[in-house]
């Protein structure tokens, strides 16, 4: 009915519904129905040749209304008829009568209308969003926020009229919008995601695109149409972004990385002498295995220019995730204050020729000032530990000497503990503490960290008694040992050889 009103040249179509009597009245101020007899003929359109060629009406719109009510009255162009819908559907004869003093308003009244009031409201609100003429429900105009005349900036294209959300005048182009909505003859026919999400709007050319009968709510060859729409959106978006590049300063344009990426226009950054912050990260703390989480890297917020990179003021490295390449490369990057290249740029971007590839180069670990070795056994990790003054990491021609942070060498299954680290954080480099169900076991990790901390203190203490006390477990669960004194004897390998109670 809305489509018929639009085709009739109406400026508005109104719906009035009285729930108590289930009476729906539809009115419009269009040119009216030329022939009520044609209206009652299945699959015969009463529209002129121009509309038939442009929009291909098939004469089934009115027929569908007959299935939704019990009785119908139609009044238009000085003629009217009334009939039970079951009689019309049975093709019984209908008497068409003249109307005295017709007021110029086409009126269709449906009695015994089947849908509920809320259904009617929800349905009309959805249909009105992109409709080209005013839609009124119970004297209240419905929102038409996606209509061509809604104040949005539409561009004429080969597929129809296109509005690019975020890339129109005075809109925030940094606001990334992945959704789009397709309308045909003002009615919705496709949504890339939920309809409630605002996004790009395309009013398809009805001479090129068609919808399936009888409801016309689905496109014919939908997959092909959607693919073409995506190509046009990408092309139109690129044109807008090229214009923005000419208008904005390099730092401001680089801020649009996510938008450029969404439109497949990252190549527009190739000659911009400022790096987007989205492509850079830094190792923000002692690096450990991440498992299902990602927390080793933080976004580098400071601006980095092409000059910073070319002069060596800033060094940027390629580095795969911790779980793939291990601790040594990450410790090297952390202690060398390297920035990490973490997101993709176009293959022709100037930065790619100046990256330090930490993944491809071998890393050499040198232990300096080794004192002794001991075996650590926690709940989830166990390995030999080497205690030393410091250790050196070398990649290519660059090296770093570390004396305050322990390292787990997964190749040698070895904890390297320099004199400046008495914490247990290094166990996190040997295990992510995620089980086979990807659940993080915080209590086990904390227990292993505490045990390793005691293990380090015990192995670096100059007082043997203090070292022993650190290594002894808790005896809270054994009351028989409370308030007792014991003498322990250890053998040459550190195993308990004898325990004697002192009375």
Task: List each language-model region with its residue ranges.
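Flexible, glycine-/charge-rich segments associated with ATP-binding catalytic modules
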Residues: 72-74, 90-137, 142-145
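GHKL/Histidine-kinase-like ATPase module
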Residues: 118-237, 260-313, 318-321, 326-327, ...
